[in-house]
Amino acid sequence: MAQLYYRYGTMNSGKTIEILKVAYNYEEQGKGVVIMTSALDTRDGVGYVSSRIGMKRPALAIEETTDIFGYIRDLPEKPYCVLVDEAQFLKRHHVYDLARVVDELDIPVMAFGLKNDFRNELFEGSKYLLLLADKIDEIKTICQYCKKKATMVLRTQDGLPVYDGEQIQIGGNETYISVCRKHYFAPMITSNKEQNYDN
């Protein structure tokens, strides 16, 4: 039985590397996959899944009006798996489409993304994936400032923490930092060389 998986983690937890690894493993066995990502992620161009270590693959860019279910249903060859990056940016109807791909087409879907935003609120896509997914798994990484597990994303601007503003602002390491709860509320924003890992 196919299932809907949601694998979430903070920034730099290896979500995209995991997608690329899963795709490689399927394709190594001659089993085709469909890779998708949000059109909102323009860091490396629209329609690419790209990791911070330099691995990159083309992907179907999911726009507001994309009919994910119809796209997968109408493919000439049924894929063995659908992989979705930046799933936090999906809309409610996209997540319901992913559930239909699993339930009606019997194709497993693995969605990867952030759980909460810099305000510590759920993204729309994350909210519905947490509600609908058959299996939920956390991809762990450590806090930028200590040895604890990072569970939150801190937005910084001009070296200062930001707790209010627009939910979606595409950036990289210079804008967002993965932190534990303690350092979300009391960040130690310094250069990497000055970090104190004893906290």
Swiss-Prot record:
EC number: 2.7.1.21
Cysteines engaged in disulfide bonds, as pairs: none
Keywords, ordered alphabetically: ATP-binding, Cytoplasm, DNA synthesis, Kinase, Metal-binding, Nucleotide-binding, Transferase, Zinc
Active site: 86
Key word ATP-binding present: yes
Biological processes, Gene Ontology terms: DNA biosynthetic process; thymidine metabolic process
Gene3D superfamilies linked: 3.30.60.20, P-loop containing nucleotide triphosphate hydrolases (3.40.50.300)
PANTHER family, alphabetized: THYMIDINE KINASE, THYMIDINE KINASE, CYTOSOLIC
Catalytic reactions of this protein: thymidine + ATP = dTMP + ADP + H(+)
Subunit structure: Homotetramer.
CC per GO annotation: cytosol
Gene Ontology MF term list: ATP binding; thymidine kinase activity; zinc ion binding
Gene name linked to the record: tdk
Pfam families referenced in this protein's UniProt entry, alphabetically: TK (PF00265)
InterPro entries linked: P-loop_NTPase (IPR027417), Thymidine_kinase (IPR001267), Thymidine_kinase_CS (IPR020633)
Enzymatic class: transferase
Domain of life: Bacteria
Residue sites binding Zn(2+) per the record: 143, 146, 180, 183
Subcellular localization: Cytoplasm
Protein name: Thymidine kinase
Protein residues bound to ATP: 9-16, 85-88
Similarity comment: Belongs to the thymidine kinase family.
